[in-house]
C-alpha cells in the first residue's frame, strides 16, 4: 500500500506556503491568527 505522505518541497510550498496563504481570505485569516498567537513560523 502506498503511504499518504510523499514529500515534495514544491507541492509543500504551493499548497501551504506564505504566498498561497496570502492569496485567499481564509489563508490571510490563518496568517493573522498565527501572528496574534506569536508563532515563530507563519507558514511552510
Swiss-Prot record:
Residues 1-44 are annotated as: Disordered. It holds the Pfam family Ribosomal_L34. GO terms for cellular component: ribonucleoprotein complex; ribosome. GO terms for biological process: translation. InterPro entries: Ribosomal_bL34, Ribosomal_bL34_CS. Keywords: Ribonucleoprotein, Ribosomal protein. Residues 10-19, 31-44 have a biased composition (Basic residues). It comes from the Bacteria. Gene3D superfamilies: 1.10.287.3980. GO terms for molecular function: structural constituent of ribosome. Belongs to the bacterial ribosomal protein bL34 family. This is Large ribosomal subunit protein bL34. It comes from Parvibaculum lavamentivorans (strain DS-1 / DSM 13023 / NCIMB 13966). The gene is rpmH.
Amino acid at each position: 500500500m502506498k503511504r499518504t505522505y510523499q514529500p515534495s518541497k514544491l507541492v509543500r510550498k504551493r499548497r501551504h506556503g506564505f504566498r498561497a496563504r496570502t492569496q485567499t481570505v481564509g489563508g490571510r485569516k490563518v496568517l493573522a491568527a498565527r501572528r496574534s498567537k506569536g508563532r515563530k513560523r507563519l507558514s511552510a
